């Protein structure tokens, strides 16, 4: 994995564009993330995490986090699109006060999710549990910013 670029670099490159604040779309993304978070929580409490559902849990957790980051960006008039958009969204975590460790974990999550989607990478229960721990820690924090 390459080192994470600064959010301003993504702006300069045109991957992130400044736009009008889009509260309607941001609220929609927050609501969708709430539903997904509740679903992940119910799976975790019900059937639990295992090697068979690890990829699904990781993908859904990633999407939940990214929906909140996108909502926060939209509330501040930013939108990322095209090649590098997901990296730009992860780099935005620094702008909203997340630690370098959290940003690195989110970037690793992005990288592994990409590996699953495009290269057939299989993740295990242990990694999925780490992702759930990360989700449970960052989800409330980002969600509170999006109010």
Regions inferred by a protein language model and the residue ranges of each:
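Terminal alpha-helical segments
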Residues: 1-147
């Amino acid at each position: 994995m390459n080192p994470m670029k600064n959010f301003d670099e993504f702006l300069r490159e045109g991957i992130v564009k400044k736009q009008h604040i889009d509260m309607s779309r941001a609220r929609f993304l927050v609501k969708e993330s709430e539903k997904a978070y509740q679903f992940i929580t119910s799976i975790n409490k019900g059937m639990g995490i295992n090697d068979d559902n690890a990829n699904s849990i990781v993908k859904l957790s990633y999407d939940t986090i990214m929906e909140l980051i996108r909502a926060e960006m939209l509330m501040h008039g930013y939108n990322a699109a095209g090649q590098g958009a997901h990296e730009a969204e992860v780099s935005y975590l620094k702008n909203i006060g997340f630690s370098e460790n959290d940003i690195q974990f989110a970037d690793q999550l992005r990288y592994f999710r990409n590996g699953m989607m495009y290269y057939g990478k299989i993740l295990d229960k242990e990694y999925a549990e780490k992702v759930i721990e990360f989700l449970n820690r960052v989800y409330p924090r980002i969600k509170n910013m999006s109010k």
